[in-house]
Amino acid sequence: HLALDMLAQQNRILAGMTFPKEQLVTAKGKKVLIIGGGDTGSDCIGTSNRQGAASVTQIEIMPQPPVGQNPATPWPQFPLVLKTTSSHEEGCSRRWSLATHKFLGKNGKVCGVEVEQVEWIPNPDGDRPTMKSTGKIEVIETDLVLLAMGFLKPEHPQFAKNVFVAGDAASGASLVV
């Protein structure tokens, strides 16, 4: 499921709306896997725990960022540092440098996700590092996957001469929840 579908539905439930059982996206009693390490993923962790998930695991394709200051992202750049939110403190397993390969299913329902441990090779020019395959593949058992992937950085294609962009189109998406 898309993370925002679950989060929006939960907000509506908290506001008093009801949904037919077959339309509910609920973590109750489930092994939840959240793909994406940002704020939306964090919201999914808290919501899943409050709904009574059996377990919650969050995976991220990028390497674990450092705690505290990061010399690779000095001010005024956005600080790439490890963020532990109140949702993380509610309980979850966090794993880093995992690329999702495929979803596994049984009887029309997800039962696992195949992932690969990846390595990130620094770019000497200071640009985005290069992702390298390690061949270390595993399956994470799950019966609810929430897609909370974001972006690494905004892309600025040039569509036409004298065409300019502003806001999220220029700087990338901001908080959505």
Question: Predicted segment positions?
Answer:
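Residues forming the flavin
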Residues: 1-177
